[in-house]
Amino acid sequence: MKSVRYLIGLFAFIACYYLLPISTRLLWQPDETRYAEISREMLASGDWIVPHLLGLRYFEKPIAGYWINSIGQWLFGANNFGVRAGVIFATLLTAALVTWFTLRLWRDKRLALLAAVIYLSLFIVYAIGTYAVLDPFIAFWLVAGMCSFWLAMQAQTWKGKSAGFLLLGITCGMGVMTKGFLALAVPVLSVLPWVATQKRWKDLFIYGWLAVISCVLTVLPWGLAIAQREPDFWHYFFWVEHIQRFAMDDAQHRAPFWYYLPVIIAGSLPWLGLLPGALYAGWKNRKHSATVYLLSWTIMPLLFFSVAKGKLPTYILSCFAPLAMLMAHYALLAAKNNPLALRINGWINIAFGVTGIIATFVVSPWGPMNTPVWQTFESYKVFCAWSIFSLWAFFGWYTLTNVEKTWSFAALCPLGLALLVGFSIPDRVMEGKHPQFFVEMTQESLQPSRYILTDSVGVAAGLAWSLQRDDIIMYRQTGELKYGLNYPDAKGRFVSGDEFANWLNQHRQEGIITLVLSVDRDEDINSLAIPPADAIDRQERLVLIQYRPK
């Protein structure tokens, strides 16, 4: 009966965190709108080989992540949940792997379930795992690779070892098809310390070629298909999206070596109090083969991405699966022997919740700021934000009431965040970051437009997805569409600021022309260097400018 109660609690936890509240959150630009529109266009066109965004070739990522996202929209429709269904599914599958692997290592069902709950409630996992980007997919394939390699190396027969390495190659191949060659580098770097300490080089060299073969065979069908359709895809993807993005001086998202330290700290909430002890206990017990393996999969990817010039918080998502397993193991030991770390964890959550309550007041309409984050008419959003932090502090306090038994309720600290964050986003943020909000406010003006132009790729993708049309034209800025716009068949999909007046004269009689621009909050739109418009509708950071036929 206790196992049944645990399972019911787990399903309720998943429903409250990963299912019920997802539709209440609008899509964020540029990431979610981009991936939503790529998958919508894939479904609309039936082209499952070459990714397109706004009808243009889009070679920043391979295809597998778009396949999963497209299946999500196909199953659940073109809505917020459908867009995020793929990443939620991948995150839950990763948690299932965490459960299975923990059970295999320690033969403890409670520990296995706890590891999954810790993983799913980690702030970084929840934030990225309910956000429509490709990182939850690559995290799943990397964790699957972690499990496959362990299976292969622990097998006692040549058949078992061969099957494990073949499975490892498939997971690496799917990782390559999701986000590129990093899916090869991370597993190699992660297993080397374990192989070295355990002196398992022989098995690696004898069977490792099977992983190489299965990886190549996994990628080969689509790799050949896109090479035939778009011969320059692999050149662009390898040199621009890998070498330039991560290693060269002009790499995207440049950040210092220590960038991931605050990411690890914030991402470990509401289990931050367990982080030092889990890592220290793992190092202290490094003679234990499984502990070394988990430590290696936690630390080595972190070091690899720290050395790379280009950095984003999402890159290290896979590190938190083995870390959650180490945390769960350490937490049970602490509960039995010395619950000091569990008490510290409770106080950290209380402090975080109280700090959030105070910060919410400071940026509210009743606080000291001249330009508050929320306006007076948004008072219900302020109370939602207060509720988020109040619940966080409450469950932090509850874990201290009988810490040896109640410490695991820290998993409920983010419950308010999960349920209420969609209702607490300030309008000033929604107007710039949620194109759906803008479309809802300007639907009647946008719908009959013959041409729509915008100066933001994220906004363009949001407009395209909301209006179910891929013919949005870029104005003044090309952004990440620069490469796709260079093709001859993309002519007419970009209009520069200097050319706009002439372009307008040529196309005005064809129907309503709508210009959607991103502007600064205090920018005077009358100073914009554009022809006089027939209608202007400003929604704070986004402004709709319309020209009608004369």
Curated annotation (Swiss-Prot):
**Which compartment or compartments is the protein found in?**
Cell inner membrane
Q: Which UniProt keywords apply?
A: Cell inner membrane, Cell membrane, Glycosyltransferase, Lipid A biosynthesis, Lipid biosynthesis, Lipid metabolism, Lipopolysaccharide biosynthesis, Membrane, Transferase, Transmembrane, Transmembrane helix
Q: What catalytic activity is recorded?
A: 4-amino-4-deoxy-alpha-L-arabinopyranosyl di-trans,octa-cis-undecaprenyl phosphate + lipid IVA = lipid IIA + di-trans,octa-cis-undecaprenyl phosphate
The membrane topology of this protein is: Multi-pass membrane protein
GO cellular component, as recorded:
plasma membrane
User: Which Enzyme Commission number(s) are listed?
Assistant: 2.4.2.43
Q: What class of enzyme is it?
A: transferase
GO BP term (any one): lipopolysaccharide biosynthetic process
Q: Where are the transmembrane segments?
A: 7-27, 81-101, 113-133, 134-154, 165-185, 204-224, 263-283, 288-308, 315-335, 346-366, 382-402, 406-426
Q: Which GO terms describe its molecular function?
A: 4-amino-4-deoxy-L-arabinose transferase activity; mannosyltransferase activity
Position of the signal peptide: none
Would you identify the family this protein belongs to, as annotated?
A: Belongs to the glycosyltransferase 83 family.
Role played: Catalyzes the transfer of the L-Ara4N moiety of the glycolipid undecaprenyl phosphate-alpha-L-Ara4N to lipid A. The modified arabinose is attached to lipid A and is required for resistance to polymyxin and cationic antimicrobial peptides.
Which PANTHER family does the annotation name? MANNOSYLTRANSFERASE YKCB-RELATED, UNDECAPRENYL PHOSPHATE-ALPHA-4-AMINO-4-DEOXY-L-ARABINOSE ARABINOSYL TRANSFERASE
What's the protein here called? Undecaprenyl phosphate-alpha-4-amino-4-deoxy-L-arabinose arabinosyl transferase
According to its UniProt entry, this protein's organism is Escherichia coli (strain SMS-3-5 / SECEC)
Taxonomy, top ranks, is: Bacteria, Pseudomonadati, Pseudomonadota, Gammaproteobacteria, Enterobacterales
